[in-house]
Regions:
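Short, well-formed alpha-helical segments that are part of the catalytic scaffolds
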Residues: 19-31
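Short, hydrophobic beta-strand segments that form beta-sheet elements in well-ordered domains
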Residues: 34-42, 95, 100
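GT-A fold catalytic core of metal-dependent nucleotide-sugar glycosyltransferases
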Residues: 77-128
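Short beta-strand/turn micro-motifs composed of small residues
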Residues: 13-15, 41-43
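N-proximal low-complexity "stem/linker" segments adjacent to membrane-targeting elements
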Residues: 1-13
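Active-site-proximal specificity loops/subdomain of glycosyltransferases
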Residues: 42-83
Length: 132
């Protein structure tokens, strides 16, 4: 896969269901720092005009959503989300963030960080790579 850097100032999120003020304010922090904000969903969400609603079907078919089970649960959104984010980043590039993240760096700082790297990972702590 060739390295793509055209979306270094795009923040991507996935959401299903109704967005609360908490998620919207967290996502809005990325817009305020200069990111384009894409919210990927299988639903027709009501979003602030600064955000772009993207059809999650372009990344993974809806049927995949409930295929992942863990400990006899009905479905495991965390497992699906992991697969979705990797597929998204292969197809669209840009950045992936969970909706509980708040942006404190500018889009320009993120773009500079990744300008000559094929990928960037965040650390959760000294021994774990974070995936949000």
């Amino acid at each position: 896969m060739a390295y793509q850097n055209q979306n270094l100032k795009t923040a991507n999120f996935f959401w299903g269901g109704r967005l609360t003020a908490y998620e919207v304010s967290n996502m809005f922090s990325f817009f305020e720092k200069g990111f384009s904000v894409n919210v990927w969903s299988y639903e027709n969400l009501s979003l602030p005009q600064e955000f772009t609603l993207k059809n999650a079907e372009l990344i993974l078919p809806y049927e995949e959503l409930n295929k992942f089970k863990q400990n006899f649960q009905k479905s495991n959104m965390s497992s699906f989300s992991n697969l979705f984010r990797y597929e998204l980043l292969m197809k669209e590039s840009g950045w992936w963030f969970d909706s509980d993240c708040i942006c404190i760096k500018t889009a320009e700082e993120f773009a500079n960080l990744a300008s000559n790297k094929p990928f960037v990972l965040g650390l959760e702590n000294d021994t774990l790579v974070g995936s949000s």
